[in-house]
């Protein structure tokens, strides 16, 4: 399949079908047959299990991508600090990752992925470890800021609502070995908001996705 610049696509399919393997193949972390071509200078990656550095405090973990790109440490920390306020992590800047809850670590990983500022963002179950309230907040934030981010996003998720709300297209995969069973275009206007979930088109898309998955 092909993904276009600035597009958000989701990969939906049964557990173990190979969704994460597709992400790893794009990153060059696994061997595969075939060809993957990509434009763009860099890739940001948020895996299912966070890869935070336990010897660094939360703020340093979040600001690391900016520092690696040449931004002065204090300026990088200031940028990250603003994100902490947006994501409910204010007051935890000095905590080490092992002192944070699973949901907090997930939010911290998301902040770090966003601050990588890459042309391509690969998100593997990015909101899977957070509670329902936080998950909705993160979905709304990402939807609101997609244009500003300017990244092409490939997301793995098991959440049908999430896939419809965030994506331009959804690829439904078969059981292993994964094949694309169906591509579904999401025609909902952007930016999307809470009202989008009540849109009749949203309900039709949800029904269509479920019919494909459970057929």
Go through each PLM region and give its residues:
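A short, proline-enriched helix->beta-strand linker immediately N-terminal to the Walker B motif
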Residues: 115-119
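The feature captures the beta-strand-to-loop junction immediately N-terminal to the Walker
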Residues: 12-14
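Hydrophobic anchor residue at the start of the ABC signature
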Residues: 110
